């Protein structure tokens, strides 16, 4: 029988198939751990590994093949909880992982932490709601119905609607390429991803204004095409994209670095292209981290102030977001309108936190399965 060359030696398959047996390998009885259902065969058919991802049972060169025993790896929920920044501290609600507060030193430290959080976070947050409804709900609703208020809300939602999907796609592609490939300048490129974290948003707005303004590098090109960047929605979107760029990619890189690649390699062995591997294998493994990064990106996009303030010019009724509306109304001593906008921003923040909690609970629940 003619020998067949197999193209996946990394999977533990032989490079030649000889006449002695279909794979020239001795059959070693062992328990198949790839599927939850009991198997009637005493040999592990590793096509079951791919059955759950490609939706069908397949074989290599028309024959079943023995899969390598996969390396131990964390579950997707554990990776999200342990590797995804703030999720590490929030993902185990009521998990019972801490020690009981059983002495006065621990009680004192807990009390100091609770008092600090209450004074710095909770009291100012609640005071905004108290001030917004101090004169009743009717004045609050009147301010919310103001045309300038509604336009600011519209601009805020539009910025989030544009920047979050773009940074989600970029962050996913960048994270996969940075973790799956080695190339010159990789370390420098990964360092650049953290640049928006270290630069003041006001400086970001100034940089974009100098670059796309009337005397900037692209001034002539922008004049010829009739595109306005400074004091326009385009510039606001660019500024928001810059400050929110690292969130998705930085959430995904630790998960991808700790993910076992055996399933991706097996899928390619069975003929899956890059898109099928991503959609059926990679994406299910990173979905919790991806969703968490999207939530953080959205929260920052809706609350951005400094960069948007510089490049937009804070033009009322044109380039004003809710955060800029709060500043303008407060400076004009229209405190009730400022408090109304602050309450709406706080409500959006609470909604984001609620979604984040649900994501963390779902990830933690899956990790316990």
Curated annotation (Swiss-Prot):
<feature type="region of interest" description="Disordered">
    <location>
        <begin position="1"/>
        <end position="21"/>
    </location>
</feature>
<dbReference type="Pfam" id="PF00528">
    <property type="entry name" value="BPD_transp_1"/>
</dbReference>
<dbReference type="InterPro" id="IPR000515">
    <property type="entry name" value="MetI-like"/>
</dbReference>
<keyword id="KW-0472">Membrane</keyword>
<feature type="transmembrane region" description="Helical">
    <location>
        <begin position="187"/>
        <end position="207"/>
    </location>
</feature>
<comment type="similarity">
    <text>Belongs to the ATP-binding cassette (ABC) (TC 3.A.1) superfamily.</text>
</comment>
<feature type="transmembrane region" description="Helical">
    <location>
        <begin position="335"/>
        <end position="355"/>
    </location>
</feature>
<keyword id="KW-0934">Plastid</keyword>
<keyword id="KW-1133">Transmembrane helix</keyword>
<feature type="transmembrane region" description="Helical">
    <location>
        <begin position="156"/>
        <end position="176"/>
    </location>
</feature>
<keyword id="KW-0764">Sulfate transport</keyword>
<protein>
    <recommendedName>
        <fullName>Sulfate permease 2, chloroplastic</fullName>
    </recommendedName>
</protein>
<dbReference type="InterPro" id="IPR005667">
    <property type="entry name" value="Sulph_transpt2"/>
</dbReference>
<keyword id="KW-0809">Transit peptide</keyword>
<dbReference type="InterPro" id="IPR035906">
    <property type="entry name" value="MetI-like_sf"/>
</dbReference>
<keyword id="KW-0813">Transport</keyword>
<dbReference type="GO" id="GO:0031969">
    <property type="term" value="C:chloroplast membrane"/>
</dbReference>
<feature type="transmembrane region" description="Helical">
    <location>
        <begin position="229"/>
        <end position="249"/>
    </location>
</feature>
<comment type="function">
    <text>Part of the ABC-type chloroplast envelope-localized sulfate transporter.</text>
</comment>
<feature type="transit peptide" description="Chloroplast">
    <location>
        <begin position="1"/>
        <end position="82"/>
    </location>
</feature>
<keyword id="KW-0812">Transmembrane</keyword>
<dbReference type="GO" id="GO:0015419">
    <property type="term" value="F:ABC-type sulfate transporter activity"/>
</dbReference>
<dbReference type="InterPro" id="IPR011866">
    <property type="entry name" value="CysW_permease"/>
</dbReference>
<dbReference type="GO" id="GO:0005886">
    <property type="term" value="C:plasma membrane"/>
</dbReference>
<keyword id="KW-0150">Chloroplast</keyword>
<comment type="subunit">
    <text>Part of the chloroplast sulfate permease holocomplex. May form a heterodimer with SLUP1.</text>
</comment>
<feature type="transmembrane region" description="Helical">
    <location>
        <begin position="110"/>
        <end position="130"/>
    </location>
</feature>
<feature type="domain" description="ABC transmembrane type-1">
    <location>
        <begin position="153"/>
        <end position="356"/>
    </location>
</feature>
């Amino acid at each position: 029988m003619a020998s067949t060359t197999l193209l996946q030696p990394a999977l533990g398959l032989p490079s030649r198939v000889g006449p002695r047996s279909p794979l020239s390998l001795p059959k070693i009885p062992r328990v198949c751990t790839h599927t939850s259902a009991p198997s009637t065969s005493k040999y592990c058919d590793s096509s079951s590994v791919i059955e759950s991802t490609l939706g069908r049972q397949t074989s290599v060169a028309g024959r079943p093949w023995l899969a390598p025993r996969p390396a131990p790896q964390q579950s997707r929920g554990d990776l999200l909880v342990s590797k995804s920044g703030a999720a590490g501290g929030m993902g185990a609600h009521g998990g019972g992982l801490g020690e009981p507060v059983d002495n006065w030193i621990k009680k004192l430290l807990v009390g100091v932490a609770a008092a600090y959080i209450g004074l710095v976070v909770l009291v100012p947050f609640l005071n905004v709601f108290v001030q917004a409804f101090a004169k009743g709900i009717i004045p609050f609703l009147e301010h919310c119905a103001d045309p300038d208020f509604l336009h600011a809300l519209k601009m805020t939602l539009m910025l989030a609607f544009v920047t979050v999907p773009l940074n989600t796609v970029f962050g996913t592609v960048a994270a996969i390429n940075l973790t799956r490939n080695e190339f010159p300048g990789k370390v420098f490129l990964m360092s650049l991803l953290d640049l928006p974290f270290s630069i003041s948003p006001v400086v970001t707005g100034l940089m974009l204004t100098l670059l796309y303004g009337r005397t900037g590098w692209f001034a002539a090109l922008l004049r010829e095409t009739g595109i306005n960047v400074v004091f326009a929605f385009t510039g606001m979107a660019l500024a928001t994209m810059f400050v929110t760029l690292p969130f998705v990619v930085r959430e995904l890189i630790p998960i991808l670095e700790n993910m076992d690649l055996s399933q991706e390699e097996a899928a390619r062995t069975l003929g899956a292209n890059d898109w099928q591997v991503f959609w059926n294998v990679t994406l299910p493994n990173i979905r919790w981290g991806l969703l968490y990064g999207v939530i953080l990106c959205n929260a920052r996009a809706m609350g951005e102030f400094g960069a948007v303030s510089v490049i937009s010019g804070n033009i009322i009724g044109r380039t004003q977001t809710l955060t800029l509306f709060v500043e303008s109304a407060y400076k004009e001593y229209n405190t009730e309108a400022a408090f109304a906008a602050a309450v709406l921003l706080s409500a959006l923040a609470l909604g984001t936190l609620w979604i984040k909690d649900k994501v963390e609970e779902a990830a933690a629940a899956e990790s316990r399965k």
